[in-house]
Amino acid sequence: MSIFTKIAEKYDLKIISEPVCLSGGLMHKMYKINTQQGTFALKLLNPFVVQRENAMDNYAKAERIELLLEQKGIPILPSLSLGGRKMQEIDGEYFYLFDYFPGKALKSNEITSDHCKEMGKVLAEIHSIDKKYENEAFYEMSVDWNFYLAEMKHTNTKLYAMLKDALPVIQDSQNKGNQARKKLPPIVSICHNDMDCKNVLWNGSDYRIIDLECLSYNNPFMELFELALCWSGYEDCKIDFQLFQAFLQGYKNAGGEMPIDWETLYDCNNGRLEWLEYNIKRVLGIDCGNDEKEIGIEQVKETIQHIIYYAKMKNPILEHCIM
């Protein structure tokens, strides 16, 4: 029996057409389900992610923050509570159900200054909900890149060559990031942690923020810097500084507290390294499903390009930061 049939039976839903796979999920699988009771989005959670240590605790914390954002009127697409729970489980498969929102993620060539100002504004609103002046839990990044390089040599020669060429930049980014994290101002607030273009669905000027499982308390300055880059073309290795500054201005105009030391934020912004490691593991078949190798290969290529581009763009980025 398929998971769709099991869900329909458990929640008394009558499915009226074949569920449609939705694009965009790089970690989990998303489907649109038409039923007589309405249209829903289903997020099937990656079993290897769910099995990680602390995963269930992190999901539970994110759900509590999601409720808080709902109460504050932030335009999110919250998961549905069924039987008093948000996360659902049938026969060991974990998932979330959502009301379907008829919107789409913007492509980079569709993003305007107005979109960036709006995203800066809503980010400032999220950060203002519960701000605490304390140090965030800091874990030093200690990825053994030489181990992965040696493993990749036997698995994929093309990726091995790319990784080898980029290794000095990757190791420099890891070391500088670890040093910079110690210099961050002691402040944490609610952060989405992945509010880039793929996780905001637009219908005209109306929008919903999705992918809320990563909600947690983190340094708001880091999230501001990272998202201003993501919304201004960093994903395509083509930053438009007009969009970059529009995002920062939107945040500032909405009362968001602005950073002073942008260079520290630049060095701290090395989360791409963790995404690179995750996808290298997919290519090597470590802690993942057999169907994840191809997406891993593409993501490793893309992420290495991002890391190299970011290193090249340091001076122009810092020149366009506003106080």
Where are these regions (language model features)?
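A glycine-centered beta->alpha junction motif in the catalytic cores
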Residues: 47, 95-108, 154, 273-290
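Active-site acidic catalytic loop and adjacent metal/ATP-binding pocket
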Residues: 28-34, 41-42, 177-222
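ATP-binding pocket architecture of kinase catalytic cores
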Residues: 35-134
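Active-site activation/catalytic loop segments of kinase-like enzymes and analogous catalytic loops
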Residues: 221-255, 270-288
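ATP/Mg2+ or Mg2+-diphosphate-binding catalytic cores
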Residues: 277-323
